[in-house]
């Protein structure tokens, strides 16, 4: 394995401005028009898992910040989960656009995943068929670890910008598996998040400025002969933090923005404490710098009052951003790690749980995919965005799940589709009645899907 040692890069001082004739101000805003979640109808209580593994439950629930973990039976994979989320995202978008009930405006379907079901055929094509999209549609799959969902989103935004009147469906779908009784077992999970990307979006208009950083490292990988990932956990956490600090510093250089310009920042969350590990240092440094700048600008006059004002504002800002970070983790605490969808699960959780956000607020998003790619970008909440959310639907999805015992979870885990050339009938006992799609069987080395 190649191990590249990092070196200090010289950050460019500014990005090249767009020519006037190509200014983004000349085009309609593009972004997230609808947002939908699917996660399997079964979950494991991590306190019970900790007890079965002889571990203090606080290590799971407090130490890494996880309470429950989604469990996917063999009849559910990234295709069935992605189709369920995608169908809901289309329905949510159609509820506000009676002109496109046939989805004819969807010109691009892109699936970001690191749990692909075929080395040749894109999972997007299976999903395209299951949800009934028309044939005049580009359907592709993108892979770069947990960054794949963001790669799909950026591809979709570019597509919509260059195809006026068209929309794109982006699906981030994954099953995180590390093995029974392994260090990574507590950070497993399963689910899919789907987004319709359009002009004049109802939820979040993405801003053109983003900063992306790539470097080949060996923090996490999954060989093609297994569905279980391998990781250097401590090293991966260090690089996650390092990548965030790098892209944040570069983003600040390019835009002149700091944390005070954001109402909230959402993170990719392999586990819910991880984002705060990266955020805390930046938060403290930026607020400290902001206080110093405010104090320097108020050297004359009532400097004591200025000091108090700067301190009070800095404390309030930090408290607000930390509170909103916690709101962004609530769904992840109940579902676990869904790889490509984790950042967008964080976004959905924030929007569903924090009613103090307002239209016009700027949200920051940090995407990280091991191997590794990191990107920081932002978006502006749109007027009436809360009416485009479906919080009660998502809450019902989570509340109606069935809790499985540790023994039942282990049986389901071991029942996964094998990486062998054999016919397999999938689990017919653990069916989610709320997902109309299942993987029925593997026959002649082909996956056979069915709509119930």
Language model features by range: what are they?
Residues 56-80, 114-167, 173, 285-294, ...:
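Conserved catalytic cysteine-centered active-site region
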Residues 348-398:
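Catalytic phosphate/nucleotide-handling subdomain of diverse soluble enzymes
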Residues 37-38, 112-118, 144-149, 172-177, ...:
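Acidic, glycine-rich active-site loops and adjacent beta-strand->loop/helix elements
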Residues 5-16, 95-102, 287-309:
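Intrinsically disordered, low-complexity terminal tails and inter-domain linkers enriched
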Residues 56, 78-94, 123, 239-255, ...:
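Short, well-ordered amphipathic alpha-helical segments that serve as non-catalytic structural scaffolds
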Residues 237-254, 260-284, 331-332, 336:
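A conserved active-site cap/scaffold subdomain adjacent to cofactor or substrate pockets
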Residues 32, 77-150, 257-283:
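Conserved beta-ketoacyl condensing-enzyme motif
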Residues 2-75, 182-242, 377-452:
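Condensing-enzyme catalytic core mediating Claisen C-C bond formation in acyl metabolism
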């Amino acid at each position: 394995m190649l191990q590249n040692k990092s070196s200090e890069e010289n950050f460019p001082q500014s990005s090249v401005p767009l020519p006037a004739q190509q200014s983004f101000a000349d085009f309609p805003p593009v972004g997230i028009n609808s947002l939908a979640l699917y996660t399997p109808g079964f979950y494991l209580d991590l306190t019970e898992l900790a007890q079965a593994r002889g571990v203090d439950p606080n290590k799971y629930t407090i130490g890494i910040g996880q309470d429950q973990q989604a469990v996917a039976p063999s009849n559910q994979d990234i295709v069935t989960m992605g189709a369920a989320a995608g169908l809901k995202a289309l329905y949510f978008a159609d509820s506000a656009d009676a002109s496109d009930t046939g989805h004819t405006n969807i010109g691009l379907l892109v699936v970001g995943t690191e749990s692909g079901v075929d080395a040749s055929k894109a999972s997007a094509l299976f999903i395209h068929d299951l949800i009934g999209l028309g044939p005049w549609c580009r359907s592709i799959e993108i892979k770069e670890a947990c960054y794949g969902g963001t790669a799909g989103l950026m591809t979709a935004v570019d597509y919509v910008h260059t195809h006026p009147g068209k929309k794109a469906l982006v699906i981030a779908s994954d099953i995180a598996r590390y093995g029974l009784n392994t260090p990574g077992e507590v950070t497993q999970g399963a689910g899919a998040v789907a987004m319709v990307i359009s002009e004049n979006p109802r939820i979040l208009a993405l801003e053109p400025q983003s900063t992306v950083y790539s470097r080949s490292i060996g923090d996490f990988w999954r060989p093609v002969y297994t569905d279980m990932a391998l990781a250097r956990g401590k090293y991966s956490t260090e690089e996650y933090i390092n990548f965030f600090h790098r892209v944040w510093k570069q983003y600040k250089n390019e835009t002149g923005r700091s944390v005070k310009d954001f109402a909230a920042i959402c993170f990719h969350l392999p586990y819910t404490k991880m984002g705060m590990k990266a955020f805390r240092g930046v938060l403290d440094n930026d607020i400290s710098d902001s206080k110093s700048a405010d104090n320097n600008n108020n050297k004359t006059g009532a400097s004591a009052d200025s000091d108090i004002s700067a301190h009070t504002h800095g404390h309030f800002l930090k408290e607000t951003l930390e509170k909103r970070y916690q709101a962004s983790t609530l769904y992840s605490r109940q579902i676990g790690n869904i790889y490509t969808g984790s950042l967008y699960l964080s976004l959905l959780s924030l929007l569903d749980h924090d009613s103090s956000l307002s239209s016009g607020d700027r949200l920051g998003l940090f995407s990280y995919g091991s191997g590794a790619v990191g990107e920081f970008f932002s978006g502006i909440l749109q007027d009436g965005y809360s009416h485009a959310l479906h919080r009660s639907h998502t809450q019902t999805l989570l509340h109606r799940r069935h809790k499985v015992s540790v023994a039942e979870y282990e049986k389901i885990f071991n029942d996964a589709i094998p990486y062998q050339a054999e016919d397999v009938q999938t689990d017919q006992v653990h069916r989610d009645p709320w997902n109309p799609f299942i993987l029925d069987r593997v026959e002649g080395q082909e996956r056979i899907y069915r709509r119930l």
